[in-house]
Design a protein with these regions (language model features):
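Surface beta-strand/loop "capping" patches
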Residues: 1-10
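Short beta-strand edge segments in extracellular beta-sheet folds
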Residues: 101-103
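Contiguous segments within soluble domain cores/interaction surfaces
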Residues: 5, 14-16, 20-61
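Extracellular Ig-like/FN3 beta-sandwich strand-entry sites
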Residues: 14, 79-83
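Short, flexible loop/turn segments at beta-strand junctions in immunoglobulin-like
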Residues: 75-77
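Hydrophobic residues positioned within well-ordered beta-strands of beta-sheet architectures
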Residues: 17, 45-47, 71-73, 84, ...
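Short acidic/polar inter-strand loop motif in beta-rich domains
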Residues: 88-98
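Aromatic sugar-binding surface patches on proteins
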Residues: 63-72
Length: 103
């Protein structure tokens, strides 16, 4: 099951895209409450959003991004039937991807 949830809402001449990613986003400075050992860094490094295979958002995230990041933006000219794809890569080499059709 994907860690990514995508929602879209058509407005007059644009589409609102909302993305929620379930990810720990650990920066590596927190201690485990039981063992008092540092929790290793684990965060999303690169996030890419495409619409019909054309990149519309590409960003580098880091260890200061909070747990379970939420992103929202307006997509000009997004129309019903367009395919939104979200991909991420984290610092441990894990990847995830999810597709969504604008309704």
């Amino acid at each position: 099951m994907s860690s990514i949830k995508i929602r879209s809402k058509r407005l007059k001449e644009s589409t609102q895209i909302r993305i929620l990613i379930a990810h720990p986003m650990e920066h590596g400075n927190n201690q485990d409450k039981i063992t008092h050992q540092l929790i290793p860094a684990h965060f999303i490094r690169i996030l890419t959003v495409t619409c019909n295979q054309k990149v519309v958002v590409s960003c580098e995230m880091g260890d200061s991004t909070p747990k379970d990041p939420y992103l929202a933006f307006m997509l000009k000219h997004g129309k019903t039937g367009d395919k939104i794809t979200v991909n991420w890569l984290d610092n441990l080499g894990n990847i995830d991807s999810e597709e969504h059709i604008i309704n």
